[in-house]
Amino acid sequence: MAPRIERHTGPEEDREEEIHSHQSPSVSGDDDGVEISERPPKRRRLSDSESSEDDPFVPQQPLPTLSRIKKKSDLSAAKGPDRNADQPDPVTAKDAFAMGLQSMDSSFSSLGLAPWLVGSLSAMAIRRPTAIQRACIPEILKGRDCIGGSRTGSGKTVAFAAPILHRWSEDPFGIFAVVLTPTRELALQIFEQFKAISAPQSLKPVLITGGSEMRPQAIALSTRPHVVIATPGRLADHIKTSGQDTIYGLNRVRMVVLDEADRLLASGPGSMLPDVETCLSALPPSTSRQTLLFTATVTQEVRALKSMPRPKDRLPIFVTEISTENNTTIPPTLKQCYLQVPMTHREAFLHVLLSTDANSSKPAIIFCNRTKTADLLDRLLRRLGHRVTSLHSLLPQSERTSNLARFRASAARLLVATDVAARGLDIPSVGLVVNFDVPRNPDDYIHRVGRTARAGREGEAITLVGQRDVQLVLAIEERVGRQMVAWEEEGVSIEGRIVRGGLLKDVGGAKREALGEIEEGRDVLGRRVRKLKKTR
């Protein structure tokens, strides 16, 4: 193509036309002020006589833009290849039914659960049933009463929640099921699990526990929720004091669950059995309902229920106790240790133990036998620089809930607790359990150490042993069928660190400050509060 010629006739036209930097440079002539451009510029009509057979029109390239708004294709190209391109999208609750239909050959489907329920469990990454779930779910779906025993962390909640939701979805009405559990924290956890599993459906669960106002709970009960999760004491209070309109729906309950049945049916001081009997009195008789009992430690009181007389038209009670390959009641992935300490310096030994290289980053639960000890340790460890919170029965319910939420969210690394945290709580991140006080009952030890090494994970339990605790340790070893080993860490001498580092003085000063704060009636943040009262 011939180069285009542009002539300048006026003085102002002697200026060279501005050329964009991205276009090729022009070649200028010296004779007639002629500029020869090697690239096709924007076409300009010079005269009426210009032939229509001029060079074809070539559009000018757009100017570079400063806008930060880019096309999606440009953004994808800039980011490069997607590393997760081969991975499936996250499963939402809306996809649960379709997921269940596509997974009819899965293990949960073979147990007889509805497709929507199988899909919902898959959305929660629960795809393979555990031994207790494989044993109990089919029998519960047949309508049999059930007594299920399995060690901690084996999935007992799903073992009764899944069949309850399956049968409820077939005939949803009123108060379909009641779940009784000994602690508020465990009741809250079960309540949240029911909501999560039933997300594709319109289940209405309600939580009835102490520490909260009774009026809103009574209103919630009167609206006929589908599932009631409660502690026996508070539900018994409603049965005794609330009107008949509030508890009327309880007389049509189809299914009843006693979770941690060994604790609910235990007799003696602090027994919950009277409250449990009050709750059961408001429900249909045992011949008209299905009763499910689950526990990690099957006691004689629980086993005795198997031999109770039953009508001829009722199926026999299904009883299963899931044993492991080594026939123990604690996970095989749990390492049990003991550490001998002088009774007068237990706090200093605990402080150094939690500060070693192996334990300094582990989320841990520290169990005490008394609420006053737990309160003191919370204040003392806080002064020694640990991120700590507490959980015991003297705290208001709002504080108990918030403290547990902080620990779950890793805002606090240590949780100082009494046995209210020993049962049922599922916090997978816990890697260490410390028994500051040796439990008096070996079954309590089983529940305490069961807060770690859950679902096949590894965990460690360390028990601080004084001179008077030897017989308790021997009883625990006989109960669990395994011996504890002496705790040790390479290159670490706790006694040496305490002596050389002068930690006894630091810990002693922190303890005096904590005791003074308690005497003044202040909380862990130094605020003056009223004396805490224990509520049901």
Swiss-Prot record:
Q: Where is this motif: DEAD box?
A: 259-262
Keywords, A to Z, come to:
ATP-binding, Helicase, Hydrolase, Nucleotide-binding, Nucleus, Ribosome biogenesis, RNA-binding, rRNA processing
Query: Where in this chain does the record put each Helicase ATP-binding domain?
Result: 137-316
Broad enzyme group = hydrolase
Q: What is its main location?
A: nucleus
One GO location term (cellular component)? nucleolus
Provide a GO biological process annotation. Answer: rRNA processing
The record's subcellular locations are: Nucleus, Nucleolus
Q: What is this enzyme's EC?
A: 3.6.4.13
Q: Enumerate the residues binding ATP.
A: S150, R151, T152, G153, S154, G155, K156, T157
Q: What family does the database annotate?
A: Belongs to the DEAD box helicase family. DDX49/DBP8 subfamily.
Q: Which PANTHER family match?
A: ATP-DEPENDENT RNA HELICASE (PTHR47959:SF24), ATP-DEPENDENT RNA HELICASE RHLE-RELATED (PTHR47959)
The name under which this protein is listed is ATP-dependent RNA helicase DBP8
Q: From which lineage does this chain's organism come?
A: Eukaryota, Fungi, Dikarya, Ascomycota, Pezizomycotina
Gene name of the record: DBP8
